[in-house]
Regions:
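Q-loop/switch helix immediately C-terminal to the Walker
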Residues: 1-13
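Hydrophobic anchor residue at the start of the ABC signature
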Residues: 52
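Conserved catalytic motifs of ABC-family nucleotide-binding domains
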Residues: 59
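Helix N-cap at the start of a conserved alpha-helix in ABC-type nucleotide-binding domains
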Residues: 74-75
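Catalytic Walker B motif of ABC-type/P-loop ATPase nucleotide-binding domains
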Residues: 63-66
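H-loop/switch region of ABC-family ATPase nucleotide-binding domains
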Residues: 98-99
Length: 127
C-alpha cells in the first residue's frame, strides 16, 4: 500500500476530509514526491512523517505525539520541529511524549516528568 492510499483509507473514515486535506498534510510533512512508493519501502523517518501527516490531516485542536521526531535525520528533525511550533502558534494543544531533552527544551511550555508511570514533577518552561 502506498502512503497516499494509507491516508485515503484513514480519510474515508471522516467524510470531512477530502483530497485537498490529504495533499496539504503530505506537503506539510515533506513527503510529496515519495507518496507513490509502498509504505514498506519507507525509511523510519519517512514513516514518522507519514504518522505526523495522519495526525494533522483532520486539523485537530489537540495532537498527541509520541516520540514524533524519533528516527528522523537532522534535517527532518529541524523541519518537524518547525511544523510542531507552527501548529502551536495556530493555537493547537500538543501533548508530546519524548525522552529527547532537546525536543522538550525547544517544543514544550509545560513539562511533566514521570518515573515508573507516576508523575514526579510538573514545571513551566520559558520558551
Amino acid at each position: 500500500m502506498t502512503g497516499v492510499k494509507n491516508l485515503e483509507i484513514l480519510a474515508s473514515l471522516n467524510k470531512k476530509i477530502g483530497l485537498e486535506e490529504i495533499a496539504a498534510s503530505i506537503r506539510r510533512v515533506g513527503l510529496d514526491p515519495l507518496m507513490k512508493k509502498p509504505v514498506g519501502k519507507y525509511s523510519l523517518g519517512m514513516r514518522q512523517r507519514l504518522g505526523i501527516a495522519q495526525a494533522i490531516m483532520e486539523n485537530p485542536s489537540l495532537l498527541i505525539l509520541d516520540e514524533p521526531l524519533n528516527g528522523l535525520d537532522k534535517h527532518g528533525v529541524r523541519e518537524m520541529r518547525q511544523l510542531i511550533k507552527g501548529l502551536k502558534e495556530q493555537g493547537k494543544t500538543i501533548l508530546l511524549a519524548s525522552h529527547n531533552q532537546g525536543d522538550i527544551d525547544e517544543l514544550c511550555d509545560t513539562v511533566c516528568e514521570m518515573d515508573a508511570g507516576v508523575m514526579t514533577m510538573i514545571r513551566e518552561e520559558s520558551i
